[in-house]
Amino acid sequence: MDTLRTLSETKRTFYTLHTRPLNSIYRRVIEELLVEMHLLTVNVDFQYDPIYALGVTTVFDTFMQGYQPEKDKESIFNAICKAVEGDPEKYRQDAQWVKSLCEQASGEAVTAWLCELKPLEVAGNLNQMLEGIRDNPRFKYSRLFIIGIYTLLETANPEIVNDDQQRETVLTNCCQALNLPKDKVDKDLDLYRSNLEKMEQARSVLEDVVRADRKQRERREQQQQNTDSELELEKKEENTEV
């Protein structure tokens, strides 16, 4: 019998793979995602699927916007996936593929697929996967899975998720079709949207601080240049007098 890896082992693997310091503003986002994925992947009822992968990449890409240095983001994502014994390239490819379905089919067709389980031709085996979720009483629901569903709905029909009444109707139908716990779905998506707003506000404040710091630095540099120019001019005048 295989021994399940512990959270400490997962974290240790992550920090072994990504050795650069984490930007303190984003540390909580990174570690919470790592812990969430760890707890899911060691659960006996958990099954990886492309919609879950889309949830993972959506959360990472959305909440890591503005991370500096930018070049570290790929290393962090790769380390998270590998720390939970996943393939980062597969996560990316599966997420991109399932999201591309929204471009290959109409918004109505995608919504009917997720909310009524009407087969979507371009979805291939995902049709059977959704039916399997519906029929599996032990399906391991997760916040990342519903964020993947929400991202598909938002991509296919942005006006629906932006309208409270339409969003409520669609999510209710989706939960009924897939046998998902509506109370958990509401709680997870409310928190997700709330965190998006907070992150956007924090990012805006950070951008203002960076912009103000840049202007102050440019002003100091200009003042220094002016001072240097004045000193140079004084030297020339002194030499001329001599």
Model-identified regions with their sequence ranges:
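Short, recurring structural edge motifs at helix starts
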Residues: 37-46, 129-139
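Intrinsic, low-complexity N-terminal interaction/targeting segments
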Residues: 116-132
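Hydrophobic/aromatic-lined pockets within catalytic cores
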Residues: 61-64, 153-157
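A structural feature that tracks compact, well-ordered secondary-structure segments
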Residues: 148-152
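N-terminal domain-start signal
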Residues: 1-93, 169, 175-183, 194-242
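Extended, low-complexity, amphipathic alpha-helical coiled-coil/linker regions that act as scaffolds
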Residues: 67-69, 141-145, 157-187, 191
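Alpha-helical interaction scaffolds
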Residues: 88-117
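Transmembrane alpha-helical segments and their cytosolic interface motifs
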Residues: 49, 118, 137-143
